[in-house]
């Protein structure tokens, strides 16, 4: 037997190298085979419910790192709730209707307008479901636990029926109406858009300054006067029916030198406009208040059949332009509102594809709206005073990335204005984890217009509306519920397969259809109405979930999207918000803080991370960032996270190895019998348990990450485990001191594994497989550790906090000695301490082998004053010299008792007593040489 064999060197087959890319799929198959998700739900039956309702990602393409961050975050929350006494099922979902899928089919050569609509919709459905299958595997590979075999998908008959019922309740309450208000119109999609489908980009436009000649000045202006107008959308002049001024804005009548014409502009803008128009020696003839100009009539710049009326509007400012705006009620919301109030014609001169129509005039007909500027300039002639290119923020279609226009077309609307205050009242009851989120959602609802819910597309849920022979729209409870039942049985494609009369209840009549003939609506619903109905299609309809949901968690862009549409439909139906809490996340940016895009080549695919690092590293990264704001990710950042993971793993490996001979049922030492340092570590770890449990409850992942890493690096590695080898390796295998420390090791190991499970489930299960005395098959079926309280807890913490200060001072003294070449390693040191009474009392209270805690071979507590050469602090001073004696071959301490023993071992007296007591046979035979 060799001397080293008398050491209790930790033994374990738990590998240092994780091998996550290959091991994770193996664990996941095992979980699936063992039906872990179902078993966890069965365990928690009857416990308080917690419903995190999954916002549905769009079923198109591979998942990106933003998807991964979102689903991992949800998984951490659901797992932690399941391990904290809650029944927390997770039903993943997908959003499957809408334009992107139509665009994919178009790129594949499918021509929608040349094939049977039902066949086309079948292709859309097949493609959407193929994407659901693909993304489902992507999410499962991240280790996300949920009811993957029974997700919700917005194209299923049961979901579509639930959506129709949401619409029906809104219709019954009078919230649905048809109007021709201007809406966001995407010529590139040939459809109306909702606010949530708009994004803003900078756009360079041609702006024109031109003049309208006064036709009837109403006794205020002469007919040789011109009112100066500014526009950034020249094509809309073809539909201009008025000029709007601000009632309280001052306007001036001016005549520039050498100009026969007189002009009206805002007084505040005269100087800048004179410079722009090249006017010199401008004479101000008169000043008017805007309201004095009301109802003056002007000529249209070129259309002699049109008169333009001067009207008043609150939206007019003097921030730019001329203080006077031309008004085309068919092409703008403000224009529409003031136009309707003044009985102006709502003219629309652009068709659904962005092409100028016949009513725009023969010179414009057939041109694309953006290309008409030269024609407009030609038609204006000498009425054009100036033109310039301006860059401004402009709305774009978020899918096609093309600019949109405002365009008045008949659409179906949800009248948010009718129940706006109810919605705002409900927002006040929701808990927002970001206060700015509440303000943002509140302001959006407060300021938003009515919701355009109709779309002129094919792939979506039909609006369940019929038309009588006289054109009356029919949407009554009887017909809508009948449609819902048809959809529930056959799916929404039946709407296109049957005639209108075959979609109505048997025997249905309507006074507007004396001949019994009906037509059906051909528009579909906005996809935000699809996902915005999920509270009914899923949360209400799935018995395992509770409504309202406890939590909605999505990206911050969903304040105008899913958070918004879900809130509107839920309040409209039931008067309550669909969620009790909202947690929002920022966007994932690259390592430089730039937005990720394929064109820049700076995207990171979750699959690439899984291949290089493993999903665990991506999961750990999610906890390492403040996801309430935008976050950065790169392979370099993930490499740093991987290093942190390695530190966590190897620390826990040390605990596994050094409890391999520990049976908790037989070897555990009661808390009251632990040494002071072991009690301190038990209490410190219990503080970590509380911090992490509280952070899980508040969804504060970064708090968990910081607390965990700090505990492992500072409390364990830099302190407790730093001197642990002197105990667990050297003391007798069954000695009290070793069992005391193993008791703490095992307690930390088991509980920290449970605490890690929501974040690192693969690693936690791997560790659990080495803990033979734990009863649960899988750690995921266990509970998070409870927070404990201990006698004299605060007193012990105070004592050891003071000792840590003392230890830091001692380490400075040892470092100085090392720099002066007095010692090499700290075990070569004889440390002399010159304490005052406070420190002396402290060291007595610590009641431990202080030399062992400081990892020095010899320690002396001196009486009297410290020598001048000592390193002094306020309460204590130190001197360091080389310890006397020889190095013990077993414990590596320098000890004056070290000597060669009769059994061929050069060891100290302490080690000799251990060896002689525990290895009598080897002592009798003598040890082999090294």
UniProtKB/Swiss-Prot annotation:
Cofactor list: Zn(2+)
Binding site for L-isoleucyl-5'-AMP: 554
Keyword Metal-binding: yes
InterPro entries: aa-tRNA-synth_I_CS, aa-tRNA-synth_Ia, Anticodon_Ile_BEm, Ile-tRNA-ligase, Ile-tRNA-ligase_type1, Ile-tRNA_ligase, M/V/L/I-tRNA-synth_anticd-bd, Rossmann-like_a/b/a_fold
Reaction(s) catalysed (UniProt annotation): tRNA(Ile) + L-isoleucine + ATP = L-isoleucyl-tRNA(Ile) + AMP + diphosphate
Motif 'KMSKS' region: where in chain: 595-599
Protein residues bound to ATP: 598
Record family assignment: Belongs to the class-I aminoacyl-tRNA synthetase family. IleS type 1 subfamily.
Protein's UniProt name: Isoleucine--tRNA ligase
């Amino acid at each position: 037997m060799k001397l080293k064999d008398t050491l209790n060197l930790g033994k374990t087959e738990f590998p240092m190298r994780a091998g996550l890319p290959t091991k994770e799929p193996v664990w996941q198959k095992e979980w699936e085979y063992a039906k872990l998700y179902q078993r966890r739900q069965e365990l928690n039956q009857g416990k308080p419910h917690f419903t995190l309702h999954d916002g549905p990602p769009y079923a198109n393409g591979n998942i990106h790192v933003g998807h991964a961050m979102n689903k991992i975050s949800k998984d951490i929350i659901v797992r932690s709730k399941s391990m904290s006494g809650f029944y927390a099922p997770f039903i993943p979902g997908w959003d499957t209707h809408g334009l992107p899928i139509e665009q994919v089919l178009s790129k594949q050569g499918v021509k929608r307008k040349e094939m049977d609509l039902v066949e086309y919709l079948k292709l859309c459905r097949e493609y959407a479901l193929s994407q659901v299958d693909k993304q489902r595997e992507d999410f499962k590979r991240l280790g996300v636990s949920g009811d993957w075999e029974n997700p919700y998908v917005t194209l299923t008959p049961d979901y579509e029926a639930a959506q129709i019922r949401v619409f029906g309740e809104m219709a019954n309450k009078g919230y649905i109406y048809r109007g021709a208000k201007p809406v966001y119109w995407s010529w590139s999609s040939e459809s109306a858009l909702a606010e949530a489908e708009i994004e803003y980009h900078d756009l360079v436009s041609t702006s024109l300054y031109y003049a309208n000649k006064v036709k009837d000045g109403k006794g205020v202006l002469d007919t040789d006067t011109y009112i100066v107008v500014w526009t950034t959308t020249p094509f809309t002049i073809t539909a201009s029916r008025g000029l709007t001024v601000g009632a309280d804005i001052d306007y001036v009548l001016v005549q520039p030198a050498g100009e026969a014409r007189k002009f009206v502009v805002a007084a505040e803008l005269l100087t800048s406009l004179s410079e722009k128009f090249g006017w010199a020696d401008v004479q101000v003839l008169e000043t008017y208040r805007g309201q004095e100009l009301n109802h003056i009539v002007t000529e249209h710049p070129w259309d002699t059949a049109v008169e333009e009326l001067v009207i008043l509007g609150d939206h007019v400012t003097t921030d730019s332009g001329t203080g006077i705006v031309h008004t085309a009620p068919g092409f703008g919301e403000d224009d529409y509102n003031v136009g309707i109030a003044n009985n102006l014609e709502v003219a629309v001169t652009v068709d659904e594809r962005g092409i100028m129509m016949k009513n725009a005039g023969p010179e414009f007909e057939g041109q694309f709206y953006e290309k008409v500027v030269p024609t407009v300039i030609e038609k204006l002639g000498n009425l054009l005073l100036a033109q310039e290119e301006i860059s401004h923020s402009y709305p774009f279609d978020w899918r096609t990335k093309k600019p949109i226009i405002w365009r008045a077309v008949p659409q179906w609307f949800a009248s948010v204005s009718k129940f706006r205050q109810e919605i705002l009242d409900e927002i006040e009851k929701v808990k927002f984890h970001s206060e700015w989120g509440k303000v943002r959602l509140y302001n959006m609802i407060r300021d938003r217009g009515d919701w355009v819910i109709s779309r002129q597309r094919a792939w979506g849920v039909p609006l369940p509306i019929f038309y009588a022979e006289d054109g009356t729209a029919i949407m009554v409870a009887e017909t809508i519920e009948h449609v819902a039942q048809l959809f529930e049985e056959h799916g929404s494609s039946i709407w296109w397969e049957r005639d209108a009369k075959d979609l109505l209840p048997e025997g249905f009549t309507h006074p507007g259809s004396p001949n019994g003939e009906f037509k059906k609506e051909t528009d579909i619903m906005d996809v935000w109405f699809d996902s915005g109905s999920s509270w009914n299609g899923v949360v209400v309809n799935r018995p395992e979930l509770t409504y309202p949901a406890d939590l909605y968690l999505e990206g911050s862009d969903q304040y105008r999207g899913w958070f918004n549409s879900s809130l509107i439909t839920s309040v409209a139906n039931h008067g309550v918000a669909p969620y009790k809490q909202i947690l929002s996340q920022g966007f994932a940016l690259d390592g430089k803080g730039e937005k990720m895009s394929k064109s820049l080549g700076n995207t990171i695919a979750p699959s690439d991370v899984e291949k290089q690092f493993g999903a665990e590293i991506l999961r750990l990264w999610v906890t390492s960032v403040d996801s309430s704001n935008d976050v950065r990710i790169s392979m370099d950042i993930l490499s740093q996270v991987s290093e942190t993971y390695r530190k966590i793993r190897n620390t826990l490996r040390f605990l596994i190895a050094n409890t391999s001979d520990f049976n908790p049922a037989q070897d555990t030492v009661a808390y009251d019998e632990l040494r002071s340092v072991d009690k301190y570590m038990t209490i410190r770890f219990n503080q970590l348990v509380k911090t992490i449990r509280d952070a899980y409850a508040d969804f504060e992942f970064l708090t968990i990450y910081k607390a965990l890493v700090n505990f492992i690096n500072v409390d364990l590695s830099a302190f407790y485990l730093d001197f642990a080898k002197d105990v667990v390796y050297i003391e007798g295998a069954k000695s009290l001191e070793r069992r005391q420390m193993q008791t703490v090791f095992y307690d930390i190991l088991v509980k920290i594994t449970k605490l890690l499970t929501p974040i690192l489930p693969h690693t936690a299960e791997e560790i659990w497989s080495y803990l033979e005395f734990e009863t649960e098959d899988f750690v995921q079926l266990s509970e998070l550790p409870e927070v404990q309280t201990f006698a004299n807890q605060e007193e012990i913490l105070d004592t050891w906090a003071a000792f840590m200060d003392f230890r830091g001072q001692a380490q400075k003294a040892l470092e100085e000695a090392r720099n002066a070449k007095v010692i090499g390693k700290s075990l070569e040191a004889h440390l002399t301490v010159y304490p005052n009474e406070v420190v002396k009392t402290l060291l007595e209270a610590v009641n431990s082998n202080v030399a062992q805690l400081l990892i020095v071979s010899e320690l002396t507590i001196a009486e009297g004053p410290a020598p001048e050469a000592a390193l002094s602090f306020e309460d204590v001073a130190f001197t360091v010299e080389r310890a006397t004696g020889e190095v013990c071959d077993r414990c590596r301490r320098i000890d004056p008792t070290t000597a060669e023993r009769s059994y061929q071992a050069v060891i100290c007296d302490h080690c000799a007593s251990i060896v002689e007591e525990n290895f009598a046979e080897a002592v009798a035979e003598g040890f082999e040489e090294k």
